[in-house]
Design a protein with these regions (language model features):
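Extracellular/lumenal mature domains of secreted and surface-exposed proteins
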Residues: 21-120
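Surface loop/turn motifs at the tips and blade-to-blade linkers of beta-strand repeat domains
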Residues: 150-157, 194-204, 240-246, 287-292, ...
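Residue position within the beta-strands of beta-propeller blades
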Residues: 125-127, 172-173, 219-221, 263-265, ...
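An edge-strand/N-cap motif at the start of beta-rich repeat modules
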Residues: 110-151, 399
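Short coil/turn segments that connect the beta-strands within blades of beta-propeller domains
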Residues: 121-123, 167-169, 215-216, 258-260, ...
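Blade-level signature of beta-propeller repeat domains, shared across WD40, Kelch, NHL, RCC1
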Residues: 369-400
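Short glycine/acidic-enriched loop and turn motifs that connect beta-strands
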Residues: 130-134, 177-179, 225, 268-271, ...
Length: 400
């Protein structure tokens, strides 16, 4: 009897052991949703820049982006403009296919949009004409009392044009009287006459006034049109030949990198005057305001406004000397300021403080003039710098 009970217990134990060790079929778990993305930025991440986001999320049926700058999107791969500097936390939130506890529905990254002026100094460059000759000058814009630093002396006499190459930290000055273009370091040192009308092969520098830098070239206006050369003055050539057709003598110019247009004022002392634009390839010449006697030009491409110093002249719409503002197409012309008894040859904008500068001259060459600073609509003018004879001017951020 005891043997029977023993064998029954043994059989029951064996049956239980076999049942308890049987493997359970688990199957394949549902796929999870994992949020992820990458990005690339134009302009080396310097503001303003466009950032392209590439959604690399797994098993997501929807996306919501928060870019940390007030913008959001539900696009799969959005492209976003960042025009402010700083650190921005970008968060992608995905909508899952299955509601699983092991989903990873959010992914965040910090994007650094860099300051384009980091390591640079804001400077107002200007030229002057004196009894003993002309020169270039610079004032660091630091909200303190303006302190003028003179360039190293040259043989300049009437420096009517200035352009700054911020990429290479160089300053170019044209001299109408000498017939030359000079190049300086950004601190006003190391002057070099890179073009001279008296040098064989450089005769086309002639009577230069307006000038700008574009890429690896300088462009200047003089009798007969627009001319250009390499940044070191080599290979001078006529670029847009206007000859005796308006604009016969561009005396101040500015280039718009967005539209590819050159905006200019044409001399009226000896020619037909007018405010024009022309495409960089010479096509599309347009006269917006005919016959005006403009001597200085500054265009705010962001707001679409043009500022000009204009003399009243016969046959034009301007009947009173002054500083004028209009739309970039010449419409809405109105006077916003005054200039002195002699011509104003320079205007420029400080975009950090939203201020317009222009020269105010009493005599041709005595230091009895001033640089006026005002709001961009001409209001609240102030005598910013006195005891000077200002001519051309430009505000830039540059490495000194």
């Amino acid at each position: 009897m005891k043997k029977i009970i023993f064998y029954l217990i043994l059989a029951l134990f064996t049956l239980t052991l076999g049942t308890g060790c049987k493997k359970k079929e688990l199957g394949t778990p549902p796929a999870s949703t994992i949020a992820n993305f990458t990005y690339t930025a134009t302009n080396n991440g310097v503001a303003p820049c466009e950032v392209t986001f590439t959604n690399t999320s797994i098993n997501a049926k929807g996306s919501f982006w928060d870019f940390g700058n007030g913008q959001t999107s539900t696009e799969v791969d959005p492209v976003i403009l960042f025009d402010s500097i700083g650190f921005f936390t970008v968060k992608l939130t995905c909508t899952p296919v299955n509601n699983l506890y092991y989903n990873q529905l959010e992914k965040s990254m910090i994007i650094n949009v860099k300051d384009p002026n980091a390591g640079l100094t804001q400077v107002l460059y200007f030229t002057s004409r004196g009894p003993s000759g002309g020169n270039g000058h610079m004032v660091i814009l630091d909200d303190g009392v303006p302190k003028v630093q003179d360039f190293e002396a040259t043989d300049m006499e009437r420096p009517y044009g200035i352009a700054v190459d911020t990429a290479h930290s160089k300053v170019y000055i044209t001299d109408y009287s000498v017939g030359a273009i000079y190049r300086f370091n950004s601190d006003g040192k190391n002057p070099l006459k890179i073009l001279d009308v008296n040098v064989a092969g450089q005769e086309i520098v002639g009577d230069p006034e307006g000038i700008f830098v574009l890429g690896d070239k300088i462009y200047w206006g003089r009798t007969g049109g627009i001319y250009r050369a390499n940044l070191d003055g080599t290979n001078p050539e006529i670029f847009i030949n206007t000859g005796s057709t308006p604009p016969e003598y561009p005396i101040d110019m500015q280039y718009d990198t967005t539209s590819g247009k050159i905006y200019l004022v044409n001399d009226k002392t000896d020619y037909s005057g007018g405010y024009f634009s022309v495409n960089l390839d010479g096509t599309g010449l347009t006269e917006y305001i005919p016959a005006i006697d403009g001597t200085a030009l500054e265009v705010d491409f962001a707001t679409g406004k043009t500022y000009m110093a204009i003399y009243a002249s016969t046959g034009s719409s301007v009947t009173e000397n002054g500083i004028y503002m209009c739309n970039i197409d010449g419409t809405g012309l109105s006077k916003i300021g005054d200039f002195g008894s002699k011509a104003t040859w320079g205007m420029t904008i400080d975009y950090k403080r939203n201020k317009l500068f222009w020269g105010y001259k009493v005599s041709n060459s005595d230091p009895d003039g001033k640089i006026i600073r005002a709001n961009l609509d001409g209001s609240s003018p102030e005598d910013w710098l006195t005891g000077v004879s200002p001519h051309a001017m430009q505000v830039v951020w540059i490495k000194l």
